[in-house]
């Protein structure tokens, strides 16, 4: 079948299965649930992973759509049930209506295709789509990734979701859009120069927005928009190198972004704030935690030999043979991505903290010293990250 050929080309089937197993093991072993209903929490996570596994392995496009949309339900329950702030309700509305309304054209296309060909398998889709239908079909995937101008729901959902919801959303749920875009794009070769321009300029604007953020979690959320712009751009170029670049970027972003969300939660659990004004000079209190923060920031900005580095290398190899303008704007996007990664690390780990915050930090340090008995605060942080 076509889907299995596509997955075997880049070993996606095994990679997705291992990624799901790794994240399920990580979530159930490293995160201690403090809610009143841990059984309900675990049930929601298990149901979410089952839906994701079914989405990535089904051959029928209509089943892919059903599982694709059903994965929204556990995520919204996580945001509503275990979010931190009252704003989680409008964030859930944004998440639901953006993703649901954008997927309606895809549903109508699937129904029309099934009525014409009496099949919803992917190998028949190549003869069915023209350019306009192709754009309507990928709209749902573009919003899910998301593309700039349809990204409003992502920062709201990330900021209001619990740490587990943010990690799963960044690591796997956003990749559903990239996976669907890849499956449709390899069947229909259309060079969408306008959409490519939107991705490039949207990625640059997202990087500039990141440099103006004062909330750690919000910055990480907007960085996802910038990285996903690279993914969409690579898919739309319809080149072997750029397709490989997009796949590597999605895997790398899933690891780095979820790790950064987890570390931001550890900061929040210690100082009860995500503001850059209150998270300065953290390296003096939590050096091991800042070491992992630095490592993930370097991986996120594409230093060799990270996956991001090889992803960008494949992208520029493919882009050089297509359009020099794309190469120039993509270089600016890579530079700005490095800038906000450096800003993210330096604003939290270094700098001069507020005087009153130093007093609070001393009290927090004493609390964690008592909590870890004879162990130091840094050893306690290191054990959490292992």
Curated annotation (Swiss-Prot):
PANTHER family: NADH-UBIQUINONE OXIDOREDUCTASE CHAIN 4. This is NADH-ubiquinone oxidoreductase chain 4. Core subunit of the mitochondrial membrane respiratory chain NADH dehydrogenase (Complex I) that is believed to belong to the minimal assembly required for catalysis. Complex I functions in the transfer of electrons from NADH to the respiratory chain. The immediate electron acceptor for the enzyme is believed to be ubiquinone. The chain crosses the membrane at residues 8-28, 37-57, 61-81, 91-111, 133-153, 167-187, 189-209, 219-239, 247-267, 283-303, 315-335. Its main location: mitochondrion. It catalyses: a ubiquinone + NADH + 5 H(+)(in) = a ubiquinol + NAD(+) + 4 H(+)(out). InterPro entries: NADH_UbQ_OxRdtase (IPR003918), ND/Mrp_TM (IPR001750). It is found in: Mitochondrion membrane. Its EC number is 7.1.1.2. Signal peptide: none annotated. One of its GO terms (cellular component) is mitochondrial membrane. Disulfide bonds: none annotated. It comes from the Eukaryota. One of its GO terms (molecular function) is NADH dehydrogenase (ubiquinone) activity. One of its GO terms (biological process) is ATP synthesis coupled electron transport. It is a multi-pass membrane protein. Belongs to the complex I subunit 4 family. Keywords: Electron transport, Membrane, Mitochondrion, NAD, Respiratory chain, Translocase, Transmembrane, Transmembrane helix, Transport, Ubiquinone. The gene is ND4.
């Amino acid at each position: 079948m076509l889907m299995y050929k596509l997955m075997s080309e880049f070993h996606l089937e095994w990679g997705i299965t291992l990624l799901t197993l790794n994240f399920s093991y990580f979530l159930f072993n490293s995160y201690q649930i403090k809610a009143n209903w841990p059984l309900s929490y675990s049930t929601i996570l298990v149901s979410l992973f089952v839906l994701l596994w079914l989405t990535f392995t089904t051959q029928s496009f209509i089943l892919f759509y059903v599982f694709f949309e059903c994965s929204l339900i556990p995520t919204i329950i996580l945001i509503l049930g275990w979010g931190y702030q009252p704003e989680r309700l409008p964030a859930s509305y944004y998440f639901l209506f953006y993703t649901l309304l954008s997927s309606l054209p895809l549903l109508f296309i699937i129904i029309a295709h099934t009525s014409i060909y009496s099949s919803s398998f992917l190998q028949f889709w190549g003869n069915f789509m023209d350019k306009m239908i192709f754009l309507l079909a990928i709209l749902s995937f573009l919003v899910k990734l998301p593309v700039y101008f349809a990204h409003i729901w992502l920062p709201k959902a990330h900021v209001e979701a619990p740490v587990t919801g943010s990690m799963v959303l960044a690591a796997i749920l956003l990749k559903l859009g990239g996976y669907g875009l890849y499956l449709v794009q390899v069947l229909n070769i259309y060079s969408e120069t306008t959409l490519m321009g939107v991705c490039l300029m949207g990625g640059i604007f997202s990087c500039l927005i990141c440099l103006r953020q004062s909330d750690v979690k919000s910055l990480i959320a907007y960085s996802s928009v910038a990285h996903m712009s690279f993914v969409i751009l690579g898919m739309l170029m319809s080149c072997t190198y750029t397709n490989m670049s997009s796949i590597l970027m999605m895997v790398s972003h899933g690891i780095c972004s979820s790790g950064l969300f987890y570390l931001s939660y550890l900061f929040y659990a210690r100082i009860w704030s995500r503001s850059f004004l209150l998270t300065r000079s953290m390296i003096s209190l939590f050096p091991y935690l800042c070491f992992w923060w630095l490592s993930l920031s370097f991986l996120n900005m594409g230093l060799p030999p990270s996956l991001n580095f090889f992803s960008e290398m494949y992208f520029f190899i493919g882009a050089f043979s297509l359009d020099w303008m794309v190469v120039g704007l993509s270089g600016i996007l890579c530079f700005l991505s490095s800038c906000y990664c450096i800003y993210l690390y330096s604003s939290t780990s270094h700098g001069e903290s507020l005087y009153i915050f130093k007093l609070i930090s001393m009290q927090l340090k004493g609390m964690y010293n008592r909590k870890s008995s004879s162990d130091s605060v840094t050893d306690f942080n290191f054990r959490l990250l292992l």
